[in-house]
């Protein structure tokens, strides 16, 4: 018999069913979503993940991400919240900030950090909002040359990124012959453009950045220097690549690439004395902290994702261990081994090699392109992504493949294993060229994919390579939650 609650009948059976729904495991509650997750888990387990921006988070990070912290709203900052019941959230966020500064060896008197950005793109936009007035000028590495979409990318016909819509953007470039950043040309253009902010950051650039040179250019133009170290943040922790903190005013990062945490972002900013007035001797302080914090909240975000902040805190603790530092050294060693093996197989690597976790393979000499190779390799259980190479005429048919080693290094692959991976890639690209020869030089990507999917001869070759790849990948355990 139903009882009345606030004048409305309550169905006891229905309410009991509601309580059961809240307690059901995902497998029973939503079989469709569970099945999709299981399929994706299997894809990751049997495939070779070579996308440079991906990694496998640890079990501890994923447990924090799936915790009760997801339930709590906490707009504001520690000690200054707009909600009650946030004492433990304050404790967590303060711990995450402390670990972030410790991980990168930063003095809390000289640096602060905001750990609330939802990811790297919001972190970057918050910095622009804080430091550059609307339609103010910024300079970042051009997307086709290895930069990132959020660094102000636009084409001749359209402003693509919101950064280029709300701010005036001028890209700097690499030398098309060497693939290295053309710092001389950047310096000349900065004198003409007078940027308020220069961005030192990349998404597909295999060499270390010259932060000292970039800071000199920034100082000559009265500009801030911001590093976007999203791709290399784990390498920076381990000290295997140069740190941006010595020269930059602001440093942003994601937390899920080489840092191997969950998906989130951080903004580091200088605090304390910026300069001393030569006439009065008065100290001039940085005001970045208040500007950046207010840009993140309430400027661009609402309540922080506390479960993600917990995952970041866990990842930062792991990043300060000797094991993590050894892992990062192996990431770089594996990347160099992969590069050397591909060169031996006759491939051109943009810049001739790598200082970090990724390489860009130029396929023009092989007579094919990144889009077609990506599709064939994907069919063979090898995940990577197409990418423009210096000198490409069109972003619609990029010549390169971006390959990274962080994810497979997390699974335990070493240099000798990456030599085998290089041979798998080589066989996939040879198959790409064969399919392209069958479709003709004027065939579209759509026609190429139809040939790949519909031709039994090519499908047999794909199946044979995929079976070898999956048998090899299954030898290496997949980090993360058991069952997924």
Curated annotation (Swiss-Prot):
Keywords: Acetylation, Cytoplasm, Isopeptide bond, One-carbon metabolism, Pyridoxal phosphate, Transferase. The modification Deamidated asparagine is found at residue 6. GO terms for molecular function: glycine hydroxymethyltransferase activity; mRNA 5'-UTR binding; mRNA regulatory element binding translation repressor activity; protein homodimerization activity; pyridoxal phosphate binding; serine binding. Deamidation of asparagine produces alternatively aspartate or isoaspartate, which in turn can be converted to aspartate through carboxylmethylation/demethylation. It holds the Pfam family SHMT. The modification N6-(pyridoxal phosphate)lysine is found at residue 257. This is Serine hydroxymethyltransferase, cytosolic. CDD domains: SHMT. It is an enzyme of class 2 (transferase). It comes from Oryctolagus cuniculus. Belongs to the SHMT family. The active site is at 204 (nucleophile), 256 (proton donor). The keyword Acetylation applies. In eukaryotes there are two forms of the enzymes: a cytosolic one and a mitochondrial one. It is found in: Cytoplasm. InterPro entries: PyrdxlP-dep_Trfase, PyrdxlP-dep_Trfase_major, PyrdxlP-dep_Trfase_small, Ser_HO-MeTrfase, Ser_HO-MeTrfase-like, Ser_HO-MeTrfase_PLP_BS, SHMT-like_dom. Homotetramer. Identified in complex with ABRAXAS2 and the other subunits of the BRISC complex, at least composed of ABRAXAS2, BRCC3/BRCC36, BABAM2 and BABAM1/NBA1.
